[in-house]
Structures are given as structure tokens and as C-alpha cells.
């Protein structure tokens, strides 16, 4: 019987053995992949996260363009329509944004990329998502540009063009990073 438990921010694997009790597997932490939660105010930490996200999302977009099915395209299109609806109705659309990016990773049909993306969503991606939130709240006029970036990614994937999909995904993430940096530069310093 194996359990995972959270305590003080760390993940441990506990094993129960009849007659022996419960113990922590000493190799689990050493072998477990973890990323510390990024600090939104740390620009170097942000750069490292963005490099990681670029390597994953550009690769995912390229594979999605090669492997996507009609069902995958339908999921992406639904998320795009949801984001468009959110824009028209002055809503954030962050859940639809997540669904769009998730559908791209799922279209790779690579279970390891999907699992890594799920991990990053739970632990890291919120930094990237804050770029969208800040753009929507403070720079509403830029949301149309964000939507256009998403449409470019989708069009390249739909056309089965991995190079264009990779370029569009990279441009989108670089623009998201710029939007986040702009927001951070305008934030008042903590007192």
C-alpha cells in the first residue's frame, strides 16, 4: 500500500507493510520531480519558468500539429470560442485559456507531456496565468492581441504545420512574458 501525503510543502511516499508499520521511502524525494513555487516578484525565477514553459509549449504545439485529430481540433476550437465569448462579455476567460493550452498538450498524444503539463499547472503555470489576468484587468485593449496569438497557434495546428505552430506558441509565450514584466514594472514596491 503506497500513499502520498503533503506536509510542510514537501511530498513524501509512505509505505505500509503489514507487521512493520508505515515508513517514508528514503529514495522517493530524491527521485521525485519537483519545482519550488515561483516567486512572482523574482525576475530571474520568472525567466527560468518562462524558459521551461517555452521548451514544453513550443514542443507541444509542434507535436500537436503533427498528431492532432478532429476531436482534438474541436476541443481547441471550443476553448477559442469560449475565450472569445469571455472577451465580448468582459470576463477573464482564464479557464478557457487553460483549456486551450491543455487541449494542445493533449493533442500530442504523449502521456508524459500530459502528465508534466498537469504537474506544471498545479505548481508553476499560475505565474503565466497571472500575465493573462493582469492583461485583462489593466490592459483590456491587449486582450484582442492575446486572442489573435491563440488563433495563430490554432490555425497552424489545424493546418498541420509544426514549424508555424512552434513559432506561434513561442511568440505567444514571449508576449505573455512581456505583458507580465510590464505589469511587474508598474506595480508599487512592497512596503
List each model region and its residues.
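Conserved amphipathic alpha-helical segments that form helical-bundle/coiled-coil interaction surfaces
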Residues: 53-131, 149-152, 164-176
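HTH-adjacent hinge/linker in prokaryotic transcriptional regulators
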Residues: 13-51
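C-terminal-biased regions
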Residues: 142, 147-155, 162, 166-191
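Alpha-helix N-cap/N′ positions at the starts of helices
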Residues: 31, 41-44, 56, 78, ...
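Single conserved hydrophobic/aromatic residue that forms the stacking wall/gate
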Residues: 1-12
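Non-transmembrane, amphipathic alpha-helical segments
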Residues: 41-48, 68, 109, 138
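Short helix-coil transition/hinge motifs at the ends and kinks of transmembrane helices
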Residues: 38-39, 132-141
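A short secondary-structure junction motif
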Residues: 30-31, 123-134, 179, 183
Amino acid at each position: 500500500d503506497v500513499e502520498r501525503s503533503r506536509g510542510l510543502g514537501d511530498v513524501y511516499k509512505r509505505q505500509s507493510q503489514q507487521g512493520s508499520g508505515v515508513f517514508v521511502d528514503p529514495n522517493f524525494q530524491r527521485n521525485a520531480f519537483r519545482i519550488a513555487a515561483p516567486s512572482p516578484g523574482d525576475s530571474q525565477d520568472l525567466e527560468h519558468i518562462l524558459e521551461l514553459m517555452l521548451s514544453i509549449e513550443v514542443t507541444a504545439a509542434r507535436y500537436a500539429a503533427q498528431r492532432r485529430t478532429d476531436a482534438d481540433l474541436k476541443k481547441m476550437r471550443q476553448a477559442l470560442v469560449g475565450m472569445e465569448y469571455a472577451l465580448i462579455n468582459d470576463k477573464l476567460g482564464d479557464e478557457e485559456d487553460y483549456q486551450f493550452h491543455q487541449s494542445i498538450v493533449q493533442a500530442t498524444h504523449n502521456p508524459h507531456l500530459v502528465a508534466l503539463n498537469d504537474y506544471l499547472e498545479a505548481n508553476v503555470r499560475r505565474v503565466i496565468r497571472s500575465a493573462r489576468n493582469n492583461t485583462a484587468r489593466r490592459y483590456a485593449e491587449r486582450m484582442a492581441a492575446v486572442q489573435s496569438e491563440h488563433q495563430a497557434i490554432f490555425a497552424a495546428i489545424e493546418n498541420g504545420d509544426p514549424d508555424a505552430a512552434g513559432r506561434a506558441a513561442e511568440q505567444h509565450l514571449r508576449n505573455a512574458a512581456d505583458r507580465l514584466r510590464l505589469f511587474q514594472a508598474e506595480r508599487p514596491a512592497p512596503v
